[in-house]
């Protein structure tokens, strides 16, 4: 068995003195692990950092085997990612989200979403918006997508400003007014018609509150998990970074 694919490094664990089992989110083969010999060496160590994009050749005698990776770096962005205060938290959290996907199950859209997020990570606000959208996409990929395109009560497609915490459906301003205190805010940057809309600090926090609720309910708690410490660390780091920018 052999294939070649591009992949984003999610993490690795040491195997013996110089090798490592490397976890990639690949474009065509999904989340996939393989053994890399010499992973601890000077040449491979900087290549196999989380957040980097690599070209990987996977070989195994049988498809169900762990197999071996031969890896070359394509986009080595890890050092730049880690230079930002929110970088390490963000990369760690994105990796934990990607690990919710079934192993070896292709999710090409998620690969491109992750790559796009990592390429636009320098600005703390943009990074936060990307992660909220990535969390939303993870829910969709796992079968728990939110319907944010039309009002759950009336079918309207405009003036959608709420989300029902029960159904996960959008609610228009008029339909939601009597129950506004029971509904979740729908940040403008998550509405399909406002994808290029900017975001305030409150918009970002509302986005994390929205996706966080449904991730816990439908994905994490059924697995006996909670939100990662990296998620909270990322949100706090972004808040501090944007506060410093506002005061400057």
UniProtKB/Swiss-Prot annotation:
Listed InterPro entries: ARFGAP/RecO (IPR037278), DNA_rep/recomb_RecO_N (IPR022572), NA-bd_OB-fold (IPR012340), RecO (IPR003717), RecO_C (IPR042242)
Gene: recO
Protein's organism: Bradyrhizobium sp. (strain ORS 278)
Keyword NADP annotated: no
GO BP terms, alphabetized: DNA recombination; double-strand break repair
UniProt keywords, alphabetically: DNA damage, DNA recombination, DNA repair
Keyword DNA repair assigned: yes
The protein's name: DNA repair protein RecO
GO CC field: bacterial nucleoid
Family affiliation: Belongs to the RecO family.
Gene3D superfamilies for this protein: Nucleic acid-binding proteins (2.40.50.140), Recombination protein O, C-terminal domain (1.20.1440.120)
């Amino acid at each position: 068995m052999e294939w070649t694919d591009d992949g984003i490094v999610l993490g690795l664990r040491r195997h013996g003195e110089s090798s490592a089992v490397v976890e990639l989110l690949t474009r065509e083969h999904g989340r996939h692990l393989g053994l890399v010999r010499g992973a601890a060496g000077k040449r491979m160590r900087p290549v196999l950092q989380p957040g980097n994009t690599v070209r990987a050749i996977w070989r195994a005698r049988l498809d169900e085997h762990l197999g071996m990776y031969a890896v070359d770096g394509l986009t080595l962005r890890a050092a730049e990612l880690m230079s930002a205060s929110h970088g390490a938290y963000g990369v760690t959290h994105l990796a934990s989200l990607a690990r919710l996907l079934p192993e070896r199950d292709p999710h090409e859209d998620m690969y491109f979403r992750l790559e796009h997020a990592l390429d636009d990570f320098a600005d703390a606000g943009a990074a936060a918006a990307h992660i909220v959208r990535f969390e939303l996409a993870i829910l969709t990929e796992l079968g728990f997508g939110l319907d944010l395109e039309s009002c759950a009560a009336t079918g309207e497609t405009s003036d959608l400003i709420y989300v029902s915490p029960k159904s996960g459906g959008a609610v228009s301003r008029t339909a939601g007014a009597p129950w506004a205190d029971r509904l979740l805010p729908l940040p403008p940057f998550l509405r399909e018609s406002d994808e290029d809309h900017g975001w305030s600090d409150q918009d970002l926090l509302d986005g994390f509150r929205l996706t966080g609720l449904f991730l816990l309910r439908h994905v994490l708690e059924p697995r006996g998990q909670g939100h990662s410490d990296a998620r909270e660390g990322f949100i706090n780091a972004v808040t501090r970074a944007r506060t410093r920018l506002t005061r400057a």
